[in-house]
């Protein structure tokens, strides 16, 4: 199977340190602030486009059950090397066939929304996020 533009990008520009740099720290802290504003104890979180697992690992360390979905195998390898017990699967935000309907209380879809090109691709990922998120659940 041919690599997507996203996979080629992350094979060339590693994701693992981005959220640890100055601008990335601001992004991470701001995002976590808003996620925490709406999380409830025992929420099941789906982190779609999880990259190397920065959000997944942080939320898991706080006691939340988190499943990560990531497109780029290199990112998954880095993620699992750092956190071998992580619940991560290879998948595409536009077609998460491996995730059942209505399972997540919260779905995080940040990366796919700014990496996918064109409204049609973004709408596909939003529809998938809606499908896997419980009625009344939240999508970030």
Region roles according to the model:
Residues 54-95:
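Class I SAM-dependent methyltransferase SAM/SAH-binding core
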Residues 1-40, 42-49, 54:
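Conserved class I S-adenosyl-L-methionine
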Residues 136-140:
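Conserved beta-strand signature within the Rossmann-like core of class I S-adenosyl-L-methionine
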Residues 44, 65, 87, 103-105:
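Structural signature of beta-strand start/N-cap positions in the alpha/beta core
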Residues 97-107:
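A short acidic, Gly/Pro-enriched loop at the edge of an enzyme's catalytic core
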Residues 106-120:
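A short SAM/SAH-binding and catalytic strip from SAM-dependent methyltransferases
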Residues 123-135:
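A short glycine-rich, Lys/Arg-flanked "PGG" loop and its adjoining helix->strand segment in the class I
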């Amino acid at each position: 199977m041919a690599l997507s533009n996203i996979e080629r990008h992350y094979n060339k520009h590693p994701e693992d340190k981005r959220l640890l740099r100055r601008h990335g720290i601001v992004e991470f802290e701001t995002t976590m602030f808003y996620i925490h504003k709406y999380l409830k104890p025992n929420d099941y979180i789906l982190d779609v486009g999880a990259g190397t697992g920065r959000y997944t690992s942080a939320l898991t360390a706080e006691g939340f059950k988190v499943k990560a979905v990531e497109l780029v195998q290199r990112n998954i390898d880095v993620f699992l090397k750092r956190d071998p017990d992580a619940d991560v699967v290879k998948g595409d935000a536009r077609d998460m066939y491996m995730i059942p309907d209505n399972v997540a209380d919260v779905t995080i879809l940040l990366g796919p929304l700014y990496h996918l090109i064109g409204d049609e691709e973004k709408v596909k990922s939003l529809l998938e996020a809606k499908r896997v998120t419980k009625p009344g659940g939240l999508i970030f």
